[in-house]
Amino acid sequence: MTYSEMGRKIQTAGTWFVGSFMGEILLHYLECCDDVEKKLSFIEYMHKEYGEALEYTYDTTKTKCYAVFSIIKEQKVVEALDYVLQSNDKKVFDGGKENAQAVLDSIRDGKYKLPY
């Protein structure tokens, strides 16, 4: 995945979504990455836990999660979090950058293991 392709995936998911939920999705990635039923169950959880409150349709939540799954699969987590931190998108400031920095710090400190 090139940097440009990663940027398109981030735009698909939404920069704020990537920053806000990369950690949550990473925690569950290994258990559901190769199992379609578990992946859909996780997306259902994400939708009920967060998507409904954000007024996303189920399909919107699914699209956003799949975009983040592909970033993880292509081993671009650190680059994606850096992208979020460098973003000028004003919407990203509502917790997105703080969460991205916290996940990045945890990865760098070894507290957070990447699935690759």
Model-derived features: where do they sit?
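Basic, low-complexity segments
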Residues: M1-R8
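Short, amphipathic alpha-helical "recognition" segments used to contact nucleic acids or chromatin
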Residues: Q11-L40
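Double-stranded DNA-binding cores of transcription factors and transposases
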Residues: K38, F42-E49
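Short, basic interhelical loop/turn and adjoining N-cap
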Residues: K48-T63
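An N-terminal, globular interaction/scaffold subdomain
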Residues: Y58, F69-S70
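Residues in the recognition helix of alpha-helical DNA-binding motifs
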Residues: K64, V68
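Short Lys/Arg-enriched helix C-cap and helix-to-coil transition segments
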Residues: K73-N88
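Helix-turn-helix/homeodomain-like alpha-helical modules used for DNA recognition
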Residues: F93-Y116
